[in-house]
């Protein structure tokens, strides 16, 4: 290469280096200004000292995250700031008055948090905002009409009995049982039969276990990514081992939901079947999606349908399984309340050969115990919102638009200013006529974006508790006490292990 050519290359490299340095300086300035803006915005919300780079991340390790949260709930009234890393912060909210103000507004889900779910569940009801969310919510609400929910009770009972039959065989050999796995299979079986008109049994189908494992993998991977500054970039994440594992898990999940959708489409194509379904007063969840016409006259796309199926398949079995497992553990840990529930159910159902819709409103003490367990162990421990406009709270503190709020349902439910002796299991908190703040108890979130399937979930919990207590006495396994840890849903670090004794 000639001297002039070398000089030209050297000059280009110098220019490129200068441009690169300039871009780095601009990015550094942007990050600095962002941090200064956050410091000013959050100055009314104190928090423990944080590191300039990694924030409070060392304090909030996954396996101990709930304990520092509860310390903050006691120390900082109503809300406090939490720094994830240098330029990423949020405000933790755990006060019912604050919750009420936020949930009265139609704030969007925080994209910085929820966008990580898109490869898994797409842009369905959980992630939509604005008019698109309103239209989809209105379209899907009839799927949870009481006329639809009534016959589901029988389907739920059949799925529960399959699980209990398996438990009876297992405890004949060993009374110790880990319940999260089988409860997850049962709730998947239930949601597939009720909402997706599935004819088989997820509890005996080997494919269902691989689907549940993929769901567990996705929850762990996404929650770990949320906590990592390095993995926020989509390109870096796709190239990482975690990103490739996430892609494989998404593929398994989508294969499962595609198969469910295709089976229903095939069934509807049978002669006369589509007309029979259309004559029904209320359509099932999947049929609403398949028959839906948006207001502009176009059908939902295949992508839209799968997003809703992925969303409700996951939420309908996973969060419900978490709730049921913790409810059974709470009853196992409080035998006097367990026995009172059992006596109530025996008086109502006798031998328990059948349970119907009408029975569900006739078990008040059991319902009180379920609600108290959901207070102690809310299935979804937090939800995120991003302020679209400034907000002022009842105590006069305010936040500007653009701030992320983490509405800590777990913190709210364990707030001693809201619930005296919050760690004590006390079903009388939910006795008829007992007074409490309208936003003190939110196991299914609140406001217009509350859980659309909350009645379905409560019904299933009642069916499970009733039929289980008729067949088994429950006790905790003292050698393996569950350790609640934060996640997309509330989970236990070491599973939920019970000792079961068959009732003669």
From Swiss-Prot:
It catalyses: taurochenodeoxycholate + reduced [NADPH--hemoprotein reductase] + O2 = taurohyocholate + oxidized [NADPH--hemoprotein reductase] + H2O + H(+); lithocholate + reduced [NADPH--hemoprotein reductase] + O2 = hyodeoxycholate + oxidized [NADPH--hemoprotein reductase] + H2O + H(+). GO terms for molecular function: heme binding; iron ion binding; taurochenodeoxycholate 6alpha-hydroxylase activity. It is found in: Endoplasmic reticulum membrane. Its cofactor is heme. The chain crosses the membrane at residues 6-26, 110-130. It comes from Sus scrofa (Pig). This is Taurochenodeoxycholic 6 alpha-hydroxylase. The lineage of its organism: Eukaryota, Metazoa, Chordata, Craniata, Vertebrata. One of its GO terms (biological process) is lipid metabolic process.
């Amino acid at each position: 290469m000639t001297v002039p050519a070398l000089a030209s290359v050297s000059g280009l490299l110098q220019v490129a280096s200068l441009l690169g340095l300039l871009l780095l300086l601009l990015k550094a300035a942007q990050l600095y200004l962002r941090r200064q803006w956050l410091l000013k915005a959050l100055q009314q919300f104190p928090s423990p000292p944080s590191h300039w780079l990694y924030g409070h991340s060392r304090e909030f390790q996954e396996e101990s995250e709930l304990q520092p949260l509860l310390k903050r709930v006691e120390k900082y009234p109503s809300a406090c700031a939490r720094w994830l890393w240098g330029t990423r912060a949020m405000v933790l909210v755990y006060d019912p008055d604050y919750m009420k103000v936020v949930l009265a507004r139609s704030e969007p889900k925080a994209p910085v948090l929820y966008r990580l779910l898109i490869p898994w569940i797409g842009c369905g009801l959980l992630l939509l905002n604005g008019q698109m969310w309103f239209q989809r919510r209105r379209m899907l609400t009839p799927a949870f009409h009481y006329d639809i929910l009534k016959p589901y009770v029988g389907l739920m009972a059949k799925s529960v009995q399959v699980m209990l039959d398996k438990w009876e065989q297992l405890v004949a050999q060993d009374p110790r049982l880990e319940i999260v796995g089988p409860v997850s299979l049962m709730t998947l079986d239930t949601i597939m039969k009720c909402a997706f008109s599935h004819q088989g049994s997820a509890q005996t189908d080997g494919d269902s276990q691989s689907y549940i494992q993929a769901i567990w993998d996705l929850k762990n991977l996404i929650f770990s990514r949320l906590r990592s500054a390095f993995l926020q970039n989509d390109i870096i994440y796709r190239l990482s081992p975690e990103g490739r594992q996430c892609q494989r898990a998404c593929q398994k999940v989508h294969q499962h939901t595609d198969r469910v959708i295709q089976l229903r489409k095939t069934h509807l194509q049978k002669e006369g079947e589509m007309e029979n379904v259309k004559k029904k007063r209320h359509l099932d969840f999947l049929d609403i999606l398949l028959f839906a016409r948006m207001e502009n006259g176009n059908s939902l796309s295949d992508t839209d349908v799968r997003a809703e199926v992925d969303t409700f398949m996951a939420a309908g079995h996973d969060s419900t399984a978490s709730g049921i497992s913790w409810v059974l553990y709470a009853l196992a840990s409080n035998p006097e309340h367990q026995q009172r529930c059992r006596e109530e159910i025996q008086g109502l159902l006798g031998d328990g050969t059948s349970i119907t819709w009408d029975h569900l409103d006739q078990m008040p003490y059991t319902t009180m115990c379920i609600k108290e367990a959901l207070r102690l162990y809310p299935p979804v421990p937090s939800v995120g919102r991003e302020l679209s406009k400034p907000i002022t709270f009842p105590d006069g503190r305010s936040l500007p638009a653009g701030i992320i709020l983490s509405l800590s349902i777990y913190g709210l439910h364990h707030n001693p200013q809201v619930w005296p002796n919050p760690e004590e299991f006390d079903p009388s908190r939910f006795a008829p006529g007992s007074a409490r703040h309208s936003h003190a108890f939110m196991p299914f979130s609140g406001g217009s974006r509350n859980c659309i399937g909350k009645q379905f979930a409560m019904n299933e919990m009642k069916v499970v508790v009733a039929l289980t207590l008729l067949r088994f006495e429950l006790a905790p396994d003292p050698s393996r006490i569950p350790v609640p840890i934060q996640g997309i849903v509330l989970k236990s670090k070491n599973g939920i292990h019970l000792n079961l004794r068959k009732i003669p």
